[in-house]
Amino acid sequence: MFPEDEYQLEFFRTEGFVRKVCESCGGSFWTRDASRRTCGDPPCDPYSFIGSPVFREMELDSMREHYLSFFEAHGHTRVQRYPVVARWRDDIYLTIASIADFQPFVTSGQVPPPANPLTISQPCIRLDDLDSVGRSGRHLTTFEMMAHHVFNTKEHEIYWKDRTVELCDELLLGLGVDPESITYKESPWAGGGNAGPSLEVLVGGLELATLVFMNLRLDSSGEYVIKGERYSRMDNYIVDTGYGLERFVWASKGSPTIYDAVFPDIVRELSDLAGVEHDLHDPEYAEIFARNARLAGMIDLGEASLRDLRKRIAESINTTPERLERIMAPMERIYAIADHTRCLAYMLGDGIIPSNVKAGYLARLVIRRTLRMMKDLKLEIPLSEIVEMQISKLDYDDWRERMETISEILSLEEERYAETLEKGSRMVSKIASHYSKKGGRIPLTELVSLYDTHGIPPEIARETAGALGVDVELPDNFYSIVASTHSRAEQREVETRSPPFEKTERLFYYRPFDQEFDATVLGIFEGSVVLDRTLFYPEGGGQPADRGVLVRDGQVFNVNDVQMIDGVVLHRVEQEGLSPGDRVTGRIDMRRRMAHARHHTATHIVNDSAKRVLGRHVWQAGAQKSEDRARLDISHYRRISDEELKAIELEANRRVMEMIPVITEFMPREEAERLFGFQLYQGGVPPGREIRVVRVGSDIEACAGTHVTNTGMIGPIKILRTERVQDGVERIEFAAGEAAVQRIQERDDILAEAASILRVPIEQLPRTVFRFFEEWKDQQKVIEHLKEEIAGIRILTLSSEAVDVNGVSIVARDMGESDGETLLKAATMLSERDITAILGGASGGAAKIVVSVGRSGLERGLNAADIVRAAAKYIGGGGGGKPDLAQGGGPNVGGLRAAIDAGMSAARKALQV
């Protein structure tokens, strides 16, 4: 907690505020109403604005514009929204707050903000309360955080606490809020590695805004403890405010739920399609949802169950929980679908591709939850149509242009969901059977695993298991639990010792085509040589390290690996002997360097070409370069077709032939982001104030690799193959320059060899191969016919060899050189004649045993699988099958006769002979 003096503001004193302690929760708050006894925050105070709006009615667009214009009029610069997928962050997948736009580089002071002070209305996505959406009356997955931010330094303060509260108060009073209804509640805040005192702004029981005064940073040895973590003072201090756009609109309308305030048209449309009557003009009906929202606002839905909430509401309106469920459940699903489809509009509009990992996992989670609720409501409408309704209400032209792609993505997801439901029942049945035998219920961990690994919704698991009489552990907040485990990127802690040297001068950026350089040895660090300057490129960004030699007075030291730690380049050499102060000459393996440079620049071109052909949703998911080939992983919602692949290859080679200059320059991060946006971070987010920007035509990325200076230097680009490395990610493997020529020559050699074998020109290969294939198919038919005739003749012979064993006809025979198919046909034909067959044969250097049991043998208890297992030991193998037909095999052809005899003995024993 923060001491009282953190909140003793001049503004509060001059405006007649008094500091009070809430009689309910014990928290401190500021109010103009001296008689007030509670803080205004639920559960201390219920929602009083429902049915009694706190200011004039506003829609989303008008409220947003009013807010932004207000702060522009007070000296703030309006900043455009950031994407909801946090491309500039490597620790989170989604933009969860407006301050996330400026973490970590601006908040840490490394990079100046885009404006100071600034105002923004930032769409955010939080899935922590996913299961409460629709049920609570107030929770949303997607919301706009209107904000004004100030980034103060010790040298220059723009404004701090007093002015922040003054602006907030002026905004509220200007909207018509009763001054005495406003409370400012003291509350410590922490998030994203920062912390500070904050004030929650409450009106009518609803938190409209939070004013955070960020002045602490996470520090394990810090003097301040906030929410169990230690913090120390920051060099800068930041005004971080968040005003909930949707909450302001709700407070202005006083509707029973936030969904009726924010999505009135969508809710009405979905209600009509689902055949659900939603008449908020009916006082009794509206009061049910209003009471639900008021009660939900008073309790923690993470701790209380939906059943408890239903019971309390039912008691308050003198009805049964069952009747209440019938009234509310359909509308709760409609509310959630309205919310979720807006969430999907932002996710897919900003380029997320549904998959099983990272942000794609979260998108698929929302899609499948939406589809499940649509199924429950029997909504016969494509999901894409509802998302299109949402997009039509959002003012983003580029989204409308991409609607065809978004529709295709959602259609594919619907198909995949249907397939999942089909296979899910079978899988759950097996698991339910397992837990049924143990006498327990299916645990939560199993349900999470079913969803994470196979995409099977918990509701399907509950229905399927319930039909088998098995209970499941399914909490009300299941989806919130799952979402929380996937909301942040995995942070891998790699322990490395920082080299005690100045940063190495990196000559490879300024002299990329020089082969030789002179340098001084600064020292040896963990077996690697540290120089004051180097041309050797260290491994990084998917590009392998350079190789070459260091030469001292004629003595050669082979450099076989190069790494960089904290700006210090480490040269791993095979020989020992170098010492600090030695002067050396370095020579680079330029053939390797140029192969890497060609492949690296080609990667940028192929990535850009894929965007042109497949769509702007394509985003680099990984890359690796080598001397002889490169690979690029891209986000895409389906397999790349052959035609699309050809188009990408052609587009890439056109970029080569255009001889586009490759421009590399170091730029301040904020300037690069302002000029080029977040496409800069296709290959990841580099650290530091200054970043290296590589421009290859329309492809512009932050990149530290080596490149050619003109696309014409790349030479040909040949795509070798594609594969789906994971759901939602396609891998394109290609070669460039000399490596591409070698791959083309290898394919030419294969074609030439094939043409030589068939004795036709290469141009006639397809026609000739097709003709041979057709002839081969015809010959196969003839061969099959002949095999059947031969088998028929053999059957007559074998039938005559059958011996009677206690009333069962059995034939045991070594068929010589025979494949498994021939043996199976013969054995099947014999069993149809009610003859049990034990047949052996050899093919391709391996022995094969097939056993079939006729009707009379089955009646007497003969089991083909048992006979095969007894026989297969003698050929060094095993086998199995069904009682009427089984087969086995092994490498010991010489033991075939003994195996057949063993099979016969097993049959006799079974027949008690």
Curated annotation (Swiss-Prot):
Cofactor requirement: Zn(2+)
Reactions accelerated catalytically: tRNA(Ala) + L-alanine + ATP = L-alanyl-tRNA(Ala) + AMP + diphosphate
SMART domains in alphabetical order: tRNA_SAD (SM00863)
Cross-referenced InterPro entries: aa-tRNA-synth_II, aa-tRNA-synth_II/BPL/LPL, Ala-tRNA-lgiase_IIc, Ala-tRNA-ligase_IIc_anticod-bd, Ala-tRNA-synth_IIc_core, Ala-tRNA-synth_IIc_N, Ala-tRNA_lgiase_arc, Ala-tRNA_ligase
Subcellular compartments: Cytoplasm
Cofactor note: Binds 1 zinc ion per subunit.
Pfam family, one: tRNA_SAD
Keyword annotations from UniProtKB, A to Z: Aminoacyl-tRNA synthetase, ATP-binding, Cytoplasm, Ligase, Metal-binding, Nucleotide-binding, Protein biosynthesis, RNA-binding, tRNA-binding, Zinc
PROSITE patterns: AA_TRNA_LIGASE_II_ALA
An example molecular function term from Gene Ontology annotations: alanine-tRNA ligase activity
GO cellular component labels: cytoplasm
GO terms classed as biological process: alanyl-tRNA aminoacylation
Entry domain remark: Consists of three domains; the N-terminal catalytic domain, the editing domain and the C-terminal C-Ala domain. The editing domain removes incorrectly charged amino acids, while the C-Ala domain, along with tRNA(Ala), serves as a bridge to cooperatively bring together the editing and aminoacylation centers thus stimulating deacylation of misacylated tRNAs.
Family under the similarity heading: Belongs to the class-II aminoacyl-tRNA synthetase family.
Protein name: Alanine--tRNA ligase
Gene: alaS
